[in-house]
From Swiss-Prot:
GO terms for cellular component: extracellular region. This is Ornatin-E. The lineage of its organism: Eukaryota, Metazoa, Spiralia, Lophotrochozoa, Annelida. One of its GO terms (biological process) is cell adhesion. A motif (Cell attachment site) lies at residues 42-44. Keywords: Cell adhesion, Secreted. It comes from Placobdella ornata (Turtle leech). Pfam families: Ornatin (PF02088). InterPro entries: Ornatin (IPR002463). It is found in: Secreted.
């Protein structure tokens, strides 16, 4: 389930973050982004941290 992030989270994570993550960091391809933001492409396999 993906929810709209706050403005600060938007700057960090990109457009969406994964609901239920304690650090509120977005995930790309099932892995948390530790730097940059999550770029959601067309299809989960193409999600990348940028």
């Amino acid at each position: 389930i993906y929810v709209r992030p706050t403005k600060d989270e938007l700057l960090y994570c990109g457009e969406f973050r994964e609901l239920g993550q304690p650090d509120k960091k977005c995930r790309c391809d099932g892995k948390p982004c530790t730097v940059g933001r999550c770029n959601f492409a067309r299809g989960d396999n193409d999600d990348k941290c940028i």
